[in-house]
Structure formats: structure tokens, C-alpha cells
């Protein structure tokens, strides 16, 4: 308590934020929204920085470094989630954002990359020690920023005894491994000691990717990844809700360029040893032996066969693909909601393209159908990486069932176009912008200053949620046809 005042009750030690006494937040920080969300959130901030880097890369870098400083990061390595619950868990996107800002800034500020890298080693270790309860490389991160996407609040223990093994948490950690691997390889080009750390993340990625594909998260019948409820007896029950949870494994992809192994001999030697002596992981790292375009090598959770099956659903306009981007939940759940009983509690997930119909997380956020920019952006970036490996000969139907074939680069371009169209005058609607489709408060001749809403209607593209969420929806600036993040890891 305060000096000279009565001591607060002992129950304070059980309340939120009680373990964050080290915090001293007295800095200029990018806010998600100065009106509805005037507080920082670590994963929002990471996306803000990618948009900000196009106009002020110095500020973007300062923001990413700031959250890693000792007056923000917990001594155990956790990054603060957001101000009302510092100890909650958000997706680990800080490394991805640092790499993207590094790239936008011309791939020249190695000091910045090194500063962030060293602190993120602590954060990665926190994740492994705290969120992999069984030590089997399958993770349980909680709600991970996706609020009501599941049948129950993933921040809490499942209604039934056991653990929720999460497709998205495990995929995020595989992605985190690849981000830190890329950082280490970039730094190793200037300091060979980083080759040792690069090897660590190559191997750890392999362990996580193997677990992802062998411990029940992949559903062979549906061709999709799901969360799995594992009871105390070890029995697994997949929660067959087709949502962004099953698309996040696409993010775990990296391309090693053809000359990398020649330039980093220690890393190459150890990698070849691992491949030769660990045949149980061959399914995960098989494409290391199979050069793609320009001798590129592929590291990914999702191999070509599963990639094609996932994309068949993702690019289906009756499921994820809308006129204005990818929905957060398959539209198939409009006519076929997911229903089940978990621990005696009846649960249901419906397709809800607009505001949430459930009270989870206050009801003002909804991941059961709307389009959200951050994850759409990461899908697009991942497709561009796959394109670099497969080239123009590997195509999919776009949209599914149309008979029109497209390369993965063309799919990425089309998704970018659909997202940008939210803010552009629609000639088929009298010049009205889809973002304003839900309201007459904004006339058709509104000036060229559309609002960047928090999320968007899954069928119409209308802006929803916070109306000034310029932060991560500002990622639309990174979708312009310049400066794309489709490069291989070149070191």
C-alpha cells in the first residue's frame, strides 16, 4: 500500500497484475485507438510498427525495443499483454514485426535486430517453460487474442477436466522459431557465433512442427487443423470448429536461399547432421533436400499436400473467402453451427459476420465471422513465401470450384485487392465505400478519409467495432504493391 495509509487486504495478492510490480510505464506508446482503446497491447503494437515503419521507421524500431526493456518485460521473460491484464497471453508476433520493420528500413540496422533478438530469447524461453505443460511441444496459450473464436473462453480452464491443446498456440510457436531462426541467420552473416543459436531454432522448429502433425491437431478427414481437448486419461477430442485457428499453421513457413548453406558452414554442417541422424523428423524437413525455385529450400509445418487441402477450404466463398478478405470463421457454420457438450456445459459456435451475439470478452469483439486485418496480412505474407519456393507451376483454384487456376502469388495479390477494396469507392454501389455500407451517418461523398475500423463484416465489408482502430488496420498500407515481405532468408 501507500506510505502512511492502511495496508490493503491480503486478497490483493490474488488479483490481476499483482506480479507486475516492476512495471514503470512512462513512455510515448502507439495506442490501438485513442478513443475506445486508449491503452497499449503488445500484439497490436507489433502490427502498428509494421505500418508505422513506412513513414517513421525510427519510431517503429523504438516501440519494438521499448516493450523488451526491463521496465516493461517481466523478469521471467514475459511481455506485458495489455494494461488491464499484463499477465495474459498474446500471440508471439514481436519477432516477426522486428524482421518486417528491419526489412522495410532497408535491412541495414543490425544493431536494432540484435537488441530485440537478445531479449526475445528470454521471451521464447518463457513460452516454452510456461505454455508447454506436458513438455511435448504442443502448446496451450489461452485465448491468444482471438477472444470468442472457440466454443468456450480459452483464457480459462476447459469446462471438462484436461487440457486444451491448441492448433494456433502450437503454430504460433513454430512461427516464432522460424522468426528467431531468420534473425539469427541474418546476424550470423556478420557474426558467426550466431550460427549456434540458428541451429537451436532450426531443431526446435522441427520438434514443434513434428508434434503439430503427429499429435492429433491435424484432421485427415476434414483436411484441416483443429484444437483438441485432451482429458486426464489421454483421450483426445477434436473441436471441429473451422476457424482461423486452423489457418494459422500456414504462418510457419520460411525459405532458405540457395547460397545460405555455403555462406554459413557451421549451421549447414549441424543441419545436415540433424537431418541424417533424426529420421523420425523426415516428414517435417523433407523439403530441405528438395530445392525449389532458384535452389530455395522450404521449412514449414504444412507440406504441399496439406497446403492444397487447406487452401481448398480457405479459398471457398462458402467458407472463408469473402469479397473483402478472409473470414475469421467458416461461413459453413451459418447453416451448420458447431454444437457439443463439454464437461456438462452445452457449447455452440455460429457464424456471426457482424457484432458478437455472445457476451464473451464484453461482446464488443468478434472472431466468429468478421474479417480482421492482422491475420489476413500474415496469410498473404505466408502465401508469398510459399510462392518463392514453388514458383509458377504450383497452382490452386481461385475461388474454389471456379476452374480458374492461380499461383500462390496471384492468390496473395487477390486477397490484398479484396482487403484494399474495403476502403475504395465501389462503382457497383454508386461509389459508396464498403467500409461505410452499414450506416447512413457517412454520406457517399464523404471526403477521402475513410475510417479504419477494428474489424469488418464477413459478408459486406462494413466497418465494425472501434471506428478509429487505425493501429493494426493500418496494415493496409503494407498491402500496397511495393516492399513486399516475400524474400527468402538470405543472411
Regions found by a protein language model. Give the residues of each.
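Acidic, mature catalytic/reactive cores of soluble proteins
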Residues: 1-491
